Regions:
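Flexible, processing/modification-adjacent segments and terminal tails
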Residues: 1-56, 76-82
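Gly/Pro-enriched, hydrophobic low-complexity segments
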Residues: 41-122
Length: 122
């Protein structure tokens, strides 16, 4: 089923961040900007993609002190403020790799909460 393949690839991408930013077809904006959101300071990296890879615009927010990836945001059409932002909270160790334990999703347009993905290892 195409939807299952899409979701598998999408979540593989999310769990592979930020290393997936090195994938072919990823275009990283050369200038990193500083941004403060709710009192938290971030280094923000903008990524777009070659047409064969994807059409969305993504922003990746790294903690200014630790450089840990703390949130990301994507737009299908940035001028419409569509898409979502995702907050990463807590960490879990999976086979020696630190992974975000909780991923909370919100709409860009109105900050409405969508859902939280929770990673658990048993």
């Amino acid at each position: 089923c195409e939807r299952v393949k899409y979701l598998r690839n999408y979540y593989t991408y999310l769990y592979g961040l930020p290393m997936k930013l090195n994938d072919p077809g990823t275009i990283i904006e050369p200038k990193v900007e500083k941004r403060t959101i709710n009192g938290e300071e971030y280094w923000v990296l903008k990524a777009t993609y070659e047409e064969s890879v994807g059409r969305d615009t993504w922003y990746f927010f790294f903690d200014k002190q630790t450089f840990a990836l703390k949130r990301y945001q994507f737009f299908h059409d940035e001028s419409k403020n569509d898409g979502e932002y995702i907050l990463l909270n807590d960490e879990i160790l999976v086979e020696g790799i630190k992974m975000p334990k909780n991923r909370s999703w919100y709409f860009n347009s109105n900050d409405k909460f969508l859902a939280t993905d929770r990673l658990s290892v048993e």
